[in-house]
Regions:
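Hydrophobic transmembrane alpha-helix bundles
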Residues: 20, 65-79, 115-132
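A solvent-exposed, acidic/Ser-Thr-rich amphipathic alpha-helical stretch
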Residues: 39-110
Length: 165
């Protein structure tokens, strides 16, 4: 099903899924967040606008399940200096659209806007951009095949980013 056909699909279940995903991140429930991904799922934050591939240049994040687990292990370690004190975040998800849908295969491409505010060590940082979730139906919910976050300032200078957006 193409984008024109996807326009008639109810976006409410997808919005709810994205809001629940953001809540897991805000609650620092990183292992529950990782469980939303398929076994071959990836999380990608490109370092350049319109970057086509995570393989031909650097990315801010490009994690498969193994790298997600390693990153989460580090985030949960009691002596991780980059997270002392731990970050507190608030995500806002909006402008959700069903871009493409293949209902027979149970696969959907969902676009949305994301804003994340991170507060740590008396400093506040703001991240904003468009995100695209490639979702696969899993019973009454979905699993993430790929999450791509295109930050509006992806090619800017960043201090270390530890928590997922």
């Amino acid at each position: 099903m193409d984008a024109a056909s996807a326009a008639g699909i109810d976006r409410a279940p997808f919005e709810l899924f994205l809001i629940e995903e953001a809540a897991l991140l805000d609650q620092r429930r990183f292992r529950d967040w990782m469980a939303l991904f398929t076994e071959d799922g990836t999380y990608w934050v490109p370092a350049e606008p319109d970057q086509e591939s995570p393989f031909n240049q650097a990315s801010l994040f490009y994690d498969d399940r193994d790298l997600m687990k390693t990153r989460i292990d580090r985030l949960e370690h009691p002596r991780i200096h980059i997270q002392t004190p731990p970050s507190r975040t608030a995500h806002l998800i909006g402008n959700t659209i069903v871009e493409t849908a293949d209902e027979a295969a149970g696969e959907f491409l969902i676009g949305s806007t994301v804003i994340m505010v991170e507060y740590r060590d008396e400093q506040q940082r703001l991240f904003a951009g468009r995100q695209r979730h490639r979702l696969r139906r899993d019973g009454d919910s979905f699993r993430i095949v790929q999450k791509r976050v295109d930050l509006i300032n992806c090619d800017g200078a960043f201090e270390a980013m530890a928590v997922p957006i």
